[in-house]
Amino acid sequence: MSSLFRQVLIVLVISTLIIVGINGMVFGAGVNPQIANISYWYADDDIRAVIKSRLGDSVYIAPALPNNAELIRDVAAAALLEAQAGKPALIPVNLNNSHWTGIAIRTKLDGNIIVFYNDSFGTSIGGASSQSGQYIEAIKKILPTAEIVDLRVHQQNDGSSCGAFTAENLIALAGLSQVNLTPEAARDLLANITDARTIRILQLGSLEAKIITAAEIIEGSIAGKYAEAVSEVAFSDMAN
């Protein structure tokens, strides 16, 4: 396991804990311990709980939908409105009830919308009849000026961790600095998120974490200690 990946995970934990602390919110989603099982396939509720535990109400999380063009158009429209209002809009996409991918919609400093899509297998956006393709087409129809970026970053090497990668990718893309919303920055970020077991343990840890207040964050040590603790558990588990 590279030290770079470890550092990326620690930075992600610290940054999202700071968001939680500053907002002063309590995110009490029930913990599903199965998400740490490498063979467990995430449900929509798991993905939403992981994202909400890290980002709270600072983002819009779209519901997972069946392959229904009208519903997809409605969610795409709602997501664009949220993004234009300043909230990162995150869309978990369930492809034929067999694979999760994700769409993150952000507003750049110049006010233009950029749409990131990634499939953790590294495959491209699907055709017009696929759910991913329908989302992208709906976004383009609603907002023709939107910049669509198909990241195609290959991360996943098993058959069960697409939900874990989708949740972590969406969290990472939501946290990408507004001054650095470029395809290159997004690809570089996701390229460091590659170990399914570590990601699952990180996500379970974030769901179980104690509430950390803004004052504790400012005092300095608690966020770092928690990030290190999660990281140590993850790497100890991988070594065994």
Each model region followed by its residue ranges:
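Small-residue-rich hydrophobic membrane-insertion segments
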Residues: 2-3, 19-20, 29
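Hydrophobic core
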Residues: 13-21
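Cysteine protease catalytic domains with a Cys-His-Asp triad
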Residues: 27-102, 107-116
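Contiguous terminal or domain-adjacent regions
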Residues: 169-240
